Amino acid sequence: MARLKSLYNEELKQQIKEELGLANVMQVPKITKITLNMGVGGASQDKKLLEGAVADMTAIAGQKPVVTKARKSVAGFKIREEWPIGCKVTLRGEQMYEFLDRLVAIAIPRIRDFRGFSPKAFDGRGNYSLGIKEQIVFPEVDFDKIDRIRGMDVTITTSAQSDEEGRALLKAFGFPFK
């Protein structure tokens, strides 16, 4: 079992229940999924860029990403409908907790000039989105083998009903908020 999953089940559930004043342990919010998204701007002109992004995402997430395609043509961006423009991965279960552990314990401390995540990035329903500017903060990505620096979006979807519940959950997992 993943370290953070067992920590959540054994200690954090009770701690969050008391902190939020919930009556039942089943009301305690939990993380349902983590979605990683990497948009590759120049993928419409150069197919190799997308292959590099897929390789990086596979190394980071531990599973093969699905290639995202443009929903409609936009002349200003020089893309057509159905052209590949990025990739995404949805993590659930054990892999989700393993990724969260690596994110909190290894990747976040390696971010340059990091002063904590903004508490304003909650969506009103307890879900949290954050952006990572460089994929090299993850130890799985070999610095010598990358073709360019890419960023990614990380969305943590929770079962929380409000931002306060979501913040309490992520703080218990060790997320550094400002």
Curated annotation (Swiss-Prot):
Provide GO CC annotations from the record.
Answer: ribonucleoprotein complex; ribosome
Identify the keywords attached in UniProt to this record, alphabetized: Ribonucleoprotein, Ribosomal protein, RNA-binding, rRNA-binding, tRNA-binding
Under the GO molecular function aspect, what terms does this record hold? rRNA binding; structural constituent of ribosome; tRNA binding
Q: Which InterPro entries match?
A: Ribosomal_uL5, Ribosomal_uL5_bac-type, Ribosomal_uL5_C, Ribosomal_uL5_CS, Ribosomal_uL5_dom_sf, Ribosomal_uL5_N
> Record's Pfam families?
Ribosomal_L5, Ribosomal_L5_C
Q: Name one GO biological process term.
A: translation
HAMAP family for the chain: Ribosomal_uL5_B (MF_01333_B)
Q: Which family does it belong to?
A: Belongs to the universal ribosomal protein uL5 family.
Function field: This is one of the proteins that bind and probably mediate the attachment of the 5S RNA into the large ribosomal subunit, where it forms part of the central protuberance. In the 70S ribosome it contacts protein S13 of the 30S subunit (bridge B1b), connecting the 2 subunits; this bridge is implicated in subunit movement. Contacts the P site tRNA; the 5S rRNA and some of its associated proteins might help stabilize positioning of ribosome-bound tRNAs.
- Give the quaternary structure: Part of the 50S ribosomal subunit; part of the 5S rRNA/L5/L18/L25 subcomplex. Contacts the 5S rRNA and the P site tRNA. Forms a bridge to the 30S subunit in the 70S ribosome.
- Protein's name in the database: Large ribosomal subunit protein uL5
The gene for this chain is: rplE
